[in-house]
C-alpha cells in the first residue's frame, strides 16, 4: 500500500495501479484581476494569498493541490512595458534570477507546500508565454483582440518574445521544483480563439515556446502537467497537444466533449485529470452530496481508475462549498477500498 497521498499521486502520474483515486479542486483567491497581476509587489497581498491557500488545505484536506499563482500571473517585462505595435515586443527582456517576481514567488509557494507537511503532492500554475501576453492585453488594456492583431501582423516578433519569456519561466519553474517542494508545474495553454489564425501559424510561432519550456522542466522533474484551458467555453484541438513533453493532461471535458477515457487514448495512455464541469451549472457546484457522489462513481466506472485524477474542468467558482470536494474524495476512495 502506498505510504501516503503524496506517493499515490506520483504513482498515479506514473500510471501505476493504486489503492485510491485522488481528487482535487481549486479556485482563485483574488477577485481583483489587477491584484492577480500586480499583487507580488505588495508583501501584504502575498501573505494574504499564502494564508488563504493554507486555510483552504486545513478546511478541505484535499488529496492533492493545484496551487494558484494569484498575485504572480505575469512576467514583469510583460507588465511594465507598453506595446503599441508588434515592434514594441522587443522590450520584453529577461529578468535577473533574483528578481522579486521570482524570489517572492518561490518563497510564497514554499510556505504553502511546507504547510502540507509532506502529506500530499502539488502542482503550481504557470501561464504559458502566449497566455501571459494575452492576459496582459485583456486585464491591463481591456483589449482581448490585440494579441491576434500582433500575431497576424508580425508573427516572428511574437515568437521571439515568447522564446525570451520561456527562458525565464524555465528559471522560475526550476527554482520552484527544487526549492519550494512542488512536484511539477501545471502549464496553462490555450490555442488562439480567432478563426483567422491558422493551425500552421500557431504551430510555427506559438507552440515552440511551450514545448521548449515543458521539455526543460521535464528534465528537472518528470511530473509536470499541461492544462488545455477551456475556460468560459473556449475550444481547443486536443490532438495538437499529444506530443507535448508532459507527464499528464488536463482539459475541459465538458467543453471539448472528450471524456477522460477518450483523452487517455488520445494522449497515448498517459495520466489524465478532470471529469467535473466547473461552472455554476454543473453538479459539482449545485448538486447534493448524493448527486455529487453518484457522479463521482459514474466517472470512475466509465473511465477507469488507473492513471486518473478527479478534478474540475478548470477553476471552480469562488463560493463553492468546500464540502463538495470532500464528498468527491470520499466517494472516489470508498469506491476503491478492497479493490
Predicted regions and their residues:
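Membrane helical hairpin/interfacial module
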Residues: 50-74
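Active-site loop segments of alpha/beta catalytic cores
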Residues: 1-30, 37-40, 52, 63-67, ...
